[in-house]
Design a protein with these regions (language model features):
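Charge-lined substrate channels and their catalytic hotspots, especially those that engage the 3′ end
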Residues: 1-311, 318-363, 395, 400-405, ...
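Electropositive polyanion-binding surfaces
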Residues: 200, 206-207, 233, 247-695, ...
């Protein structure tokens, strides 16, 4: 039997990552695997170390939700706060609430831990507000906390919520994964919402000086969610602008929808300083997804006297977006396009993103071409760059190219592909394969995790399936990587400031946690003979390849990595094993690419962009932080819509039973991903009534005390829907049985 001294040692080592989730002493018992006879010693250890728990109540932070906060779904440890805990230090961040209603502030750097905010220190802030926080000390050596000094920027102006009436007062309740609050609401004449109906509301008064805020109903949305209401809920609460400013639309309206061609192969741009090369005779094609709307890139592989050249033509967005104009300001504020299953919120007005900038087939388009020669061994040489004019021969899809290439490989006649293009695709496949091998040789990480594709019909999700990943995808990926790298090397060699795409190596503590988890799953000693991080990660991926834990090792590996970002420093790209890398190939949908296009033109001698280079030199760091943040905002919005859409989809199949596999564990249960449709849901341990289960973080399992039934990653289960919450994008499953064979095998 373990005594108080044992438990004090255990708590010093293990309490920190668990503390936020422990809201009753019973939670501590489960997390630590405390036997009944050890509970007195464990409580004494808790008390001696200042871990206060109210055993009579559900927890000091409100009602128990049965699952852990979204930000704490199993992930690897974050880095230290870099001195941000010192008393008096002030930091800016975004206020959010955990699922238990506990306020925290998320700082701009994703590597820094969140700041805890007690309820009495919230001031007048609402969830999603950008706030200034001052660190303050607690008595008795307890961890410091944050006090909100002021609201820097309001996070929500409009929101989708449920209308209700209570005590004769009308209100709208807003709920998502980060917030849950209600505001009194006014209902304009002509609108008559029913209790429980979804409405779009606008906040007219924010809570200040003890006064409660107020809202007004703007639009009625019906009783049930659709893809439209989900998209509206996410974009409004996350400040994703759905409309362009009037100035941007007026500016876009003045741009001719077609490209006027001057005679001659090399003519200067109108009001420009660089010759534009006429490449319309070359067989450029675009290869994109079937539902793509904007075509940034076209590719062409030509052979001249036994020498091969790859040409990557990218939409010349900088020609159409004047520096400092309203389109430019709107695009910078957005930072990126946002893609949902059934719609896109573009960075540029549609007349540009889907019109004159998009490389549609059979029409003249202005581009920037990267021309890369290959030697006889198939190795790329020094690239050249030029403004260009192309006319795409065909708009191909990944499916088109995959079907054509696989039919040839299987000995059947190629599909309906023009001869010249078909032959070019076959040669492209060979060159892409060589590039892929070279990438592996230099130590780049390469692992595929299936992504879900949601099919929408009639405004509702009708199907969720794994998106295919074929050689046609890899072909374009390799060519874009090569073009981006060529631009980064060219600009760096000439000393021009621009935004690099930076991916730093994972922190050592993240690596240790990943290797510890991987070793448990694979029952294999940690790989210590390789000292560099990349080799260690690739060794673990290789050890798992082809086995039942391959997916889980890849998921853990992905979570151990740092987030990529933009910045003016040349810090390398860890995942690609490149010293210098940038984003150049998607200027229609990414503002950093537009920056790089402008700097490239300056490097090629276009004097119009010389002042812009000085701007990048002075403000590159600030721009990188802003654009990295907008990228994360877009990714969060896309994930939020996907989670809600999956919850809506699975709610229509409430009577069915599914095969799934455990993907991860928490102190409150475990997550299961369905084999059929890649929908993930949570199984609260409290829903298992056949035994008393104890959680062992060391062994990575939930284990039944009596029946010894074990739940651990990789275990196959039969489950059915217990609850689907579309507002929060949360799904709960109920276990109805086990399966012998591992799913996804």
């Amino acid at each position: 039997m373990r005594d108080r001294a044992f438990w004090e040692t255990w708590l010093r080592r293990s309490a920190a990552p668990l503390r936020d989730r422990m809201r009753s002493v019973r939670d501590w018992y489960r997390a630590a695997g405390v036997a009944k006879g050890e509970r007195r010693a464990f409580r004494a250890a808790l008390k001696s170390l200042g871990e206060t728990v109210d055993r009579k109540k559900s927890g000091k932070f409100g009602r128990r939700s049965g699952r852990e906060p979204a930000a704490e779904k199993p992930s690897l440890a974050r880095g230290k706060g870099h001195g941000r805990d010192r008393e008096g230090v002030q930091r800016e961040g975004r206020l959010r609430f955990t699922r238990e209603g506990r306020p925290i502030v998320i700082l701009d750097s994703p590597q820094e831990p969140a700041i805890r905010i007690p309820g009495h220190a919230l001031s007048d802030a609402l969830p999603k507000d950008r706030v200034l926080v001052r660190m303050e000390k607690r008595r008795g050596g307890a961890p410091p906390y944050g006090r909100i000094v002021r609201v820097v920027e309001r996070g929500i102006r409009e929101f989708v919520g449920r209308y209700g009436i209570a005590g004769g007062r009308r209100f709208v309740r807003f709920r998502d994964r980060e917030a849950d609050f209600a505001l009194p609401v006014a209902v304009p004449r002509g609108l008559d919402p029913e209790p429980g109906e979804l409405v779009l509301a606008e906040i007219t008064e924010y809570p200040e000086g003890g006064k409660e805020g107020r809202a007004t109903v703007v639009r009625l949305l019906g009783k049930s969610h659709t893809m439209e209401t989900i998209a509206l809920a996410v974009t409004s609460s996350r400040r994703i602008p759905a409309k362009f400013s009037e100035g941007a639309l007026e500016e876009a309206g003045r741009i001719p929808p077609t490209v006027r061609v001057e005679r001659g192969r090399e003519k200067r741009e109108r009001n420009g300083h660089l010759p534009r090369v006429d490449q319309r005779a070359l067989p450029f094609v675009t290869i994109d997804g079937e539902d793509a709307r904007d075509f940034d890139d076209a590719v062409c592989l030509v052979s001249e006297r036994g020498r091969n050249r790859l040409l990557v033509a990218i939409a010349d967005v900088s020609h159409y977006v004047p520096l400092g104009g309203q389109i430019d300001r709107d695009a910078y504020a957005r930072g990126t396009s946002v893609y949902f299953p059934d719609r896109c919120i573009p960075m540029l007005p549609p007349s540009l993103s889907e019109g004159v900038c998009s490389l549609k087939p059979g029409v003249n388009r202005l581009t920037m071409t990267v021309d890369i020669p290959f030697n006889e061994q198939g190795r790329p040489g020094t690239a050249s760059f030029s403004p260009s004019l192309i006319r795409s021969r065909a708009r191909l899809t990944y499916d088109d190219v995959h079907s054509f290439l696989t039919q040839r490989q299987e000995g059947r006649k190629g599909g309906r592909m023009p001869g010249e293009i078909g032959e070019m695709l076959r040669r492209m496949e060979v060159f892409a394969g060589r590039l892929s091998l070279a990438r592996a040789d230099r130590g780049a990480l390469d692992f595929d995790l299936p992504e879900a594709k949601l099919v929408v019909r009639g405004g509702l999700p009708s199907e969720v399936r794994a998106a295919p990943r074929w050689e046609s995808h890899r072909l374009i990926e390799e060519f874009m990587l090569l073009a981006n790298t060529a631009v980064a090397e060219f600009l760096s060699s000439r000393g021009f400031p621009f935004l690099f795409r930076i991916h730093e190596p994972p922190a050592e503590d993240r690596m240790e946690e990943f290797e510890e988890a991987a070793a448990k799953l694979l029952k294999k000693a940690r790989t210590t003979e390789r000292r560099d991080i990349s080799s260690r990660l690739r060794a673990w991926a290789a050890a798992a390849r082809g086995g039942k834990y391959e997916r889980f090792i890849n998921m853990l590996l992905l979570r151990s990595l740092m987030l990529a970002r933009y910045g003016p420093e040349s810090l390398g790209h860890f995942g690609l094993a490149l010293t210098r890398y940038t984003h150049f190939t998607s200027p229609i949908r990414r503002y950093p690419d537009l920056i790089v296009h402008r700097v490239l033109k300056a490097a090629l001698g276009d004097g119009d962009f010389a002042p812009y280079v000085r701007t990048i030199s002075a403000a590159g760091k600030e721009m990188g932080v802003h654009l990295s943040g907008r990228e994360r905002d877009a990714m969060d919005a896309e994930r939020d819509v996907e989670r809600r859409a999956k919850a809506l989809y699975i709610s229509s199949r409430a009577e069915e039973t599914f095969s799934g596999v455990i993907t991860s564990l928490t102190g409150f249960g475990f997550y299961v991903e369905l084999e059929e449709c890649l929908v993930e849901g949570f199984v609260p341990i409290s829903s298992l009534r056949d035994d008393e289960y104890r959680f062992s973080a060391d062994r990575g399992e939930w284990l039944g005390v009596v029946r010894r039934r074990k739940f651990s990653p990789g275990v196959g289960l039969r489950v059915r829907l217990r609850k689907a919450d579309v507002d929060r994008g949360e799904i709960d499953f109920l276990v109805v049985g086990t399966i012998d064979r591992p799913p996804f095998s």
